[in-house]
Amino acid sequence: MLEKSLATLFALLILATLINRFLLWRLPERKGGEVTLRIRTWWGIVICFSMVISGPRWMTLTFFALISFLALKEYCTLISVHFPRWLYWGIPLNYLLIGFNCFELFLLFIPWAGFLILATGQVLVGDPSGFLHTVSAIFWGWIMTVFALSHAAWLLMLPTTNIQGGALLVLFLLALTESNDIAQYLWGKSCGRRKVVPKVSPGKTLEGLMGGVITIMIASLIIGPLLTPLNTLQALLAGLLIGISGFCGDVVMSAIKRDIGVKDSGKLLPGHGGLLDRIDSLIFTAPVFFYFIRYCCY
């Protein structure tokens, strides 16, 4: 099933590439440079992800740890506070806890131990100026890029009988999360009228949100029983939760960037912006979906 699912992703990319080339040929005046760049980047993302998700579990965990590191590093370039380098060592420790299936320690590590160590470390620096801003900014970055994001890696640890089961759960989450972004964008462009958060993200509309959520609920209803142990009702609820939480992650990251005064979080992914621009929805959908499916099925 994993191989068939990945083959479907490549088929969709081939279709998108052919459609883009056809439009460029038929409409030479159409400016398709950005779309072409986005598709090329998606090729790189899908190829890399396919190699990792098809490999052993430790490889996938290492991949997620690398994503957390790059995302946290990108976040640190945005905020105007000093980020202690020794805190980066918490990333491999966090994913080791996942690899050894230490769920209780995982729940304590970043939210509690990480917070206490971070706050105490800043006090020991000896300069109280900007203490609250520094600690809160760093801690929020940790929660987003390491703790919340690593819930996607926890999906690998849920099944005990089918080694591909966890990979299929990750694939299901990522496919719906990214499709949700695309669906809400297309619905918003085609029939969006009423803005949801005009001061944060003027392009987000109520019609785009509702259309995207309904689309993802239908997609979840179709592929949920194939890739997950969810029944029909649970698949619908999963689609609803992913659609809404993905929107929340998108607008929260937009609020952070607007507060800082930047349009994109970086330039790591050509045509997409930074890594945080690509995973902003996943930061919220990963923990929501993990706890939902853990409660329903495990």
Regions found by a protein language model. Give the residues of each.
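Membrane-embedded alpha-helical bundles of polytopic integral membrane proteins
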Residues: M1-L241
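Hydrophobic alpha-helical transmembrane segments of membrane transport and translocation systems
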Residues: I283, V288-Y291
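Juxtamembrane boundary at the C-terminal end of a transmembrane helix
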Residues: Y291-Y298
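A short, conserved beta-to-alpha structural element at the edge of catalytic cores
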Residues: S281-L282, C297
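Interfacial loop-to-transmembrane junctions
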Residues: D259-S281
